[in-house]
């Protein structure tokens, strides 16, 4: 058992709500240990120093979990920091433990208070071990960070004097929930200098960083004693060039600093912000580069790249990547700025494929799937966002289906059977829940009693689709029961595939899948072979999930719908699959037409409005310069970035052979665009870099495919198959 389990949870004897607490312990170490190891965690987020030096470059530890079920602890080698006389200092802020959606108050530790647990083990050459634990010998005091909140920011008062450190209280908080670090650490990844200094018509001093980011500022501040600088972080300017913060809802996103007359380097520690712009009050600024924005996200290795001859599509890919950077902080969140920032399951499942191409997210999602398992109800349902404090029964199709889609996609990308096995029960329990729901429906509920249809449950629907007259509506026109039944079939099919990979008998589920399809066709496909619900998303789901073998009528229906509107109308549910389906039915020109479209609604429309990340809504900022409803209008929301996997798989043609995983057997089949000169993409797999490029050369196209060691590959060009060799392969056609 790790050393931390011998330590005690401690809290300050006195603590004002929302103030950062500094914990301290002075100890001696006889010269000199050959190894010193620190294990540490907190109810809140911590920043730890030994003898004035940070023990890690990671931030916002211990990360975000459901603290009632799982709390990560970290282990650091601190050998180089140990001296004869030592002081360990740990600042702890409230972090993710207490906020609007996640208040874990209890009698042991009330709202706005924090706690710490830590253990240091000193090991000497002769084998002797000395341990220092958190206990009642530690002391604490309030810090100069007088306020901290994940949504609202920090207030730092350098005039505050903490006074005497006083003994802490040991609290009987459980250690049963402590687990070793599972996910990637959150770290500072990039630094962006201010690009433009703006004086708004309303008189605000604004700095534009030119890129929407998630992170915080760093700058030097000196004022007269008592001077206060207040900095607001936000995403957009109005059409008149003024500060726009309404879409943050109740989140303040503010940093306030009160001067003691000395120069200080300012960098928040216990919070993060989502922003492109800052508005500075109380400080004279002569140049925008007096401020830098520090980008933070989980420490994932970049693995996927894309480039083409169309700069707007390059910007789209840039926005997809930055949407991922801005929302992958230990948990895949929907947005990083407003009073939400939650691990919405639907957003994660639609984006997980392209996420796994852009970055190595195996460890990141392994941790979050642990969160999913911890929060899955006994019934099998998954809450709508994870972690959560709410007794949310979940069960919305396309959201709770993260239980099957995410584990399967991680297996496909990385080929890790053990990770799939670890989450098999997660998958099975969700499918079993839908089956049990279908079985228990009653005639008086006004819905079908067909035992193979997942109907009558609540669902979010095709979220933010544009196929209702009211473009501010959120649920879309697609029948929610169609979505429910389609995903019931799809999740069952994925469970069957997982069972076959793991050697688990799945005859029951194969029979179940056959009957779900039969019932789906009977109720939702008309006598002409078309969907009874005449929406793009309904057709897309039936085609992409293979729910009806006679595809031609459905393909015609979808094509006519897209052409009649002249644009996509899909929301969160249909959009990820739309271009894939159009390509699969031979409508490649139509797929490219949608991708390249610059007018609203489209993927490129936000780029014409200066977007540097993906938007939550197709109409977040309208052509007339007005905003969509501020109740739900994030400008950093990655879900629609799911189109990126079509860019990898169809435009550049990198896909895996059916029935394989881990990119061990590849089929290159790129779709050349009439309106583009070249396109290229690469994905770093466990065996090496897989790359594809096509470039027009007169009447011909030069295809270049790169195949790593231990990888089989073919190319399919104009219907002809080519067996490829390891290394670089060129084909002209």
Report each predicted region and the residues it spans.
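C-terminal capping/lid segments that line or modulate ligand- or cofactor-binding pockets
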Residues: 88, 154-157, 339-340, 358, ...
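Alpha-helix capping and helix-loop boundary segments enriched in small/acidic/polar residues
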Residues: 14-18, 37, 63-67, 77, ...
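Heptad-repeat amphipathic alpha-helical coiled-coil interaction surface used
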Residues: 411, 489, 495-496, 513
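Extracellular/oxidizing-compartment recognition motifs
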Residues: 1-338, 346-347, 363-366, 383-388, ...
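Non-catalytic C-terminal accessory modules of carbohydrate-active enzymes
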Residues: 108, 112-119, 128-160, 179-185, ...
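Alpha-helical support elements that line or immediately flank enzyme active sites
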Residues: 37-40, 216-235, 270, 346-375, ...
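Active-site acid/base region of carbohydrate-active enzymes
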Residues: 45, 141-142, 288-319, 325-326, ...
């Amino acid at each position: 058992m790790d050393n931390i389990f011998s330590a005690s949870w401690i809290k300050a004897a006195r603590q004002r709500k929302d103030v950062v607490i500094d914990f301290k312990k002075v100890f001696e170490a006889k010269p000199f240990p050959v190894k010193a190891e620190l294990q540490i965690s907190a109810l809140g987020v911590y920043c730890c120093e030994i003898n004035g030096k940070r023990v890690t470059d990671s931030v916002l530890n211990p990360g975000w979990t459901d603290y009632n079920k799982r709390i990560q602890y970290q282990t650091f080698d601190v050998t180089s920091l140990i001296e004869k006389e030592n002081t360990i200092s740990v600042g702890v802020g409230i972090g993710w433990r207490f906020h609007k959606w996640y208040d874990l108050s209890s009698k042991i530790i009330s709202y706005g208070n924090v706690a710490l647990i830590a253990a240091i083990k000193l090991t000497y050459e002769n084998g002797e071990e000395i341990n220092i634990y958190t206990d009642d010998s530690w002391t604490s005091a309030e810090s100069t960070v007088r306020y901290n909140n994940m949504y609202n920011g920090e207030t730092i008062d350098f005039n505050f004097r903490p006074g005497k450190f006083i003994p802490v209280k040991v609290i009987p908080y459980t250690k049963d929930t402590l687990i070793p670090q599972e996910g990637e650490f959150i770290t500072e990844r990039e630094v962006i200098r201010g690009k433009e200094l703006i004086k708004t018509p309303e008189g605000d001093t604004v700095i534009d960083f030119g890129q929407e980011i998630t992170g915080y500022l760093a700058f030097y501040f000196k004022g007269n004693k008592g001077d206060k600088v207040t900095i607001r972080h936000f995403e957009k300017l109005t059409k008149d060039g003024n500060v726009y913060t309404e879409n943050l809802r109740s989140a303040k996103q503010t940093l306030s600093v009160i001067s003691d007359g000395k120069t200080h380097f300012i960098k928040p520690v216990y919070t993060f912000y989502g922003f492109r712009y800052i508005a500075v009050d109380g400080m004279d600024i002569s140049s925008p580069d007096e401020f830098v924005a520090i980008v933070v996200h989980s420490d994932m290795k970049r693995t996927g790249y894309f480039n083409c001859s169309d700069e707007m599509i390059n910007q789209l890919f840039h926005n997809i990547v930055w949407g991922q950077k801005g929302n992958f902080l230990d948990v895949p969140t929907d947005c990083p700025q407003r009073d939400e920032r939650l691990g919405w399951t639907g957003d994660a499942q639609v984006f997980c494929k392209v996420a796994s191409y852009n970055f190595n997210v195996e460890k990141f999602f392994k941790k979050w799937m642990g969160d999913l398992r911890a929060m899955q109800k006994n019934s099998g349902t998954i809450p709508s966002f994870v972690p959560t404090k709410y007794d949310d029964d979940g069960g919305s199709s396309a959201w709770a289906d993260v239980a099957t889609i995410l584990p399967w996609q991680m297996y496909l990308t990385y080929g890790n059977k053990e990770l799939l096995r670890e989450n098999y029960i997660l998958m099975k329990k969700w499918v079993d829940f839908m089956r049990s729901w279908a079985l228990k429906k009653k005639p008086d509920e006004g819905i079908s009693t067909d035992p193979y249809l997942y109907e009558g449950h609540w669902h979010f629907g095709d979220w933010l689709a544009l196929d209702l007259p009211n473009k501010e509506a959120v649920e879309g026109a697609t029948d929610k029961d169609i979505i429910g039944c389609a995903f019931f079939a799809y999740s069952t099919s994925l469970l069957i595939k997982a069972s076959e990979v793991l050697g688990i008998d799945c005859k029951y589920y194969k029979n179940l899948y056959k009957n779900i399809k039969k019932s789906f066709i009977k109720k939702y496909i008309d006598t002409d072979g078309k969907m009874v619900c005449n929406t793009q998303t309904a057709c897309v789901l039936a085609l992409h999930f293979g729910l009806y073998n006679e595809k031609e009528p459905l393909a015609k229906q979808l094509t006519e719908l897209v052409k009649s509107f002249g644009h996509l109308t899909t929301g969160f549910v249909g959009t990820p699959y739309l271009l894939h389906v159009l390509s699969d039915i031979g409508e490649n020109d139509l797929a490219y037409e949608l991708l390249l479209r610059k007018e609203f609604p489209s993927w490129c429309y936000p780029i014409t409005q200066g977007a540097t990340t993906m938007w939550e809504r197709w109409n977040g900022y309208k052509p007339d310069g007005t905003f969509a409803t501020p109740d739900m209008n994030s400008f950093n929301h990655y879900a629609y970035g799911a189109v990126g996997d079509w860019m990898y798989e169809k435009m550049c043609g990198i896909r895996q052979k059916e029935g394989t995983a881990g990119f061990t057997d590849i089929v290159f089949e790129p779709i050349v665009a009439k309106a583009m000169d070249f396109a290229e993409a690469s994905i770093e797999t466990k065996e090496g870099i897989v790359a594809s490029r096509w470039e027009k050369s007169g009447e011909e196209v030069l295809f270049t495919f790169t195949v790593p060691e231990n990888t089989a590959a073919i190319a399919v060009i104009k219907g002809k198959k080519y067996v490829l060799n390891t290394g670089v392969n060129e084909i002209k056609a």
